[in-house]
C-alpha cells in the first residue's frame, strides 16, 4: 500500500477512533495499530461498534455521492458563493489567531499548534507512517548488534525456560490478585507459583509493549530498538535452542522481527473466514519441542489471551460465567462483556497450568514466566473507557499480571533466586523486568 493510500485510510478511520476514545487526542499509536491489526481483529471490533460504523456511512457516503453528482453535472460555484466562503474562512482563522496569541505568550511551552485538532491528528498520522517506514529498515540497522552472550552454568545441565506473553489481560480480573471471582483456580492451587502484585506495562499497545519485553530498549529510549536484537539472540549465543510459537498473525512489527531470530518460528493461523484459534493450539507444539532432545531450550509462546471479542477466546469448559455474548458495546451489555472477559482469564489459567505441568513432568531444571502485554478498559467507571491503546491510559490498561513458576530442580540448584522472587513479590516493577529476569 502506498504512503498516500495509508494516509487516506488513516483519515477516514478517525471517526471510529473518536467514538472509542472521545476524550483523548488521536495519537500515533492508534494509527500504528491500524497497520498491525489484521482484518479478523478489525471485524470482531467493528461488528460491535454499530454507532461508529453507521456514522461513517452517514457522514461520508452522502458527501461522496454529492461530489460525484456535482462533477457529472459540471457544476461550478458562483463567484459570490466563493467570496462568502473565503471571507468566512478568513474570519475563522483570524478568530483562532486572536485566541491563540495570548495563550502562546502566557504558556509558550504548552500552547503549541501541534496540540490543536486536527493539526495534531495529521502530525501523529505522519509520525506513524514515518515510524512504519523506518521499521522496514530494521534488518539493516540492527545487523551489527551483538550481545556476546555466554552461559555461566554447566553446559551439560538441562534447562528449559518458557516465557508466555499474555494478551489484553489485566491483573484486576485475576483471582490470584484477589478478584471477587476465582478466575484462576488452577494457579491458586499451585504453591510454587509466585505472582507479583504491582507490575505495570510500559506501553498499552501490543505492537510496542511486546518488543520492549524482549529487548534492552525501553519506553523512554524507544528509538534504540531500531539497532537492537532480542533476548532470543542472546540465548542462542549462550547455547540454547530457541523457539517462538505465536497464536497471532504476522503483522510486520518488531515482534515479528524478533520472532524470526529463533531457531524455530511457527505462527498458528485460523483457516480463512474462521474464528481465531484458541491458545491451547500451542500446547501440542510445546510437547514436540520438549521431546526434541535439546539440552537447553528457550520457548516463547505468544498467546491471544483476552483479546476482544472475548467470548471467542475459550472453549465451552471455560464458560463459567454467563451470559457471555453481546451484540453491541454499551452499558446494558456490560455484565455479559465482563462475564466473557472473566471466562477468557479462566482459559488463560487453564493454559498456564498445562504449561507448568508439562515442564514439571520433564523433571528438568525449568521455569515459566507469564506477563501480559497490557490490560483493558471494560466500561469500568464514569469515563466509559473501552479497549486499550488510548493516548491517556487508565490503570486498568497498565496494571498487568506477572507470574513465575520454578521447578523443584531449579529451586534446589538456585534457592537464592526463589528467595529473591518471594521477598520482592510486592515490589513495584514494570514490564522491563522480563528481559533482565530471563537473562
Show the residue positions of the predicted features.
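A long, amphipathic alpha-helix that forms part
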Residues: 284-287, 325-368, 404, 425, ...
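Non-catalytic, well-ordered alpha-helical segments in soluble enzyme domains
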Residues: 236, 410, 415-439
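Metal-dependent active-site segment of extracytoplasmic phospho-/sulfohydrolases and closely related
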Residues: 162-163, 344-387, 435-438
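Histidine-centered active-site microenvironments of extracellular/periplasmic hydrolases
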Residues: 178-182, 364-365, 371-415
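Active-site-proximal alpha/beta segments of enzymes that process anionic O-linked groups
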Residues: 97-163, 168-328, 430-431, 436-439
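Internal/C-terminal transmembrane anchor helices
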Residues: 79-105
Amino acid at each position: 500500500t502506498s504512503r498516500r493510500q495509508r494516509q487516506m485510510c488513516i483519515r477516514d478511520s478517525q471517526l471510529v477512533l473518536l467514538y472509542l476514545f472521545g476524550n483523548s487526542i488521536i495519537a500515533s499509536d492508534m494509527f500504528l495499530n491500524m497497520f498491525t491489526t489484521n482484518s479478523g481483529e478489525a471485524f470482531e471490533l467493528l461488528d460491535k461498534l454499530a454507532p461508529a460504523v453507521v456514522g461513517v456511512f452517514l457522514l461520508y457516503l452522502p458527501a461522496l455521492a454529492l461530489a460525484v453528482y456535482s462533477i457529472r453535472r459540471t457544476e461550478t460555484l458562483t463567484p459570490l458563493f466563493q467570496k462568502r466562503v473565503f471571507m468566512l474562512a478568513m474570519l475563522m482563522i483570524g478568530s483562532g489567531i486572536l485566541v491563540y496569541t495570548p495563550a502562546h505568550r502566557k504558556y509558550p511551552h504548552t500552547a503549541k499548534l501541534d496540540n490543536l485538532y486536527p493539526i495534531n491528528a495529521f502530525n501523529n498520522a505522519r509520525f506513524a507512517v514515518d515510524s512504519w517506514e523506518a521499521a522496514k529498515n530494521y534488518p539493516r540497522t540492527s545487523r551489527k548488534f551483538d550481545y556476546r552472550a555466554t552461559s555461566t552454568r554447566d553446559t551439560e545441565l538441562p534447562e528449559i525456560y518458557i516465557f508466555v506473553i499474555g494478551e489484553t489481560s489485566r491483573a484486576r480480573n485475576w483471582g490470584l490478585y484477589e478478584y471477587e471471582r476465582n478466575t484462576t483456580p488452577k494457579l491458586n492451587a499451585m504453591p510454587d507459583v509466585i505472582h507479583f502484585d504491582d507490575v505495570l506495562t510500559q506501553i498499552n499497545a501490543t505492537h510496542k509493549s511486546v518488543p520492549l519485553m524482549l529487548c534492552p530498549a525501553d519506553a523512554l529510549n524507544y528509538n534504540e530498538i531500531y539497532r537492537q536484537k532480542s533476548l532470543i539472540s542472546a540465548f542462542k549465543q549462550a547455547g540454547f535452542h530457541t523457539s517462538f510459537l505465536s497464536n497471532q498473525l504476522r503483522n510486520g512489527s518488531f515482534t515479528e522481527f524478533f520472532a524470526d531470530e529463533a531457531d524455530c518460528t511457527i505462527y498458528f493461523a485460523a483457516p480463512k473466514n474462521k474464528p481465531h484459534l484458541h491458545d491451547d493450539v500451542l500446547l501440542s507444539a510445546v510437547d514436540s519441542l520438549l521431546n526434541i532432545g535439546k539440552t537447553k531450550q528457550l520457548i516463547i509462546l505468544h498467546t491471544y489471551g483476552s483479546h476482544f471479542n472475548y467470548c471467542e477466546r475459550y472453549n465451552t469448559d471455560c464458560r463459567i460465567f454467563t451470559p457471555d455474548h453481546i451484540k453491541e458495546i454499551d452499558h446494558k451489555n456490560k455484565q455479559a462483556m465482563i462475564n466473557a472477559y472473566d471466562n477468557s482469564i479462566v482459559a488463560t489459567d487453564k493454559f498456564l497450568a498445562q504449561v507448568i505441568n508439562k515442564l514439571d513432568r520433564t523433571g528438568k531444571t525449568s521455569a515459566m514466566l507469564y506477563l501480559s502485554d497490557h490490560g483493558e478498559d471494560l466500561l469500568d467507571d464514569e469515563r466509559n473507557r473501552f479497549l486499550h491503546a488510548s493516548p491517556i491510559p487508565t490503570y486498568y490498561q497498565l496494571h498487568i499480571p506477572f507470574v513465575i513458576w520454578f521447578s523443584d530442580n531449579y529451586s534446589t540448584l538456585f534457592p537464592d533466586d526463589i528467595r529473591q522472587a518471594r521477598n520482592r513479590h510486592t515490589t513495584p516493577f514494570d514490564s522491563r523486568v522480563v528481559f533482565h529476569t530471563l537473562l
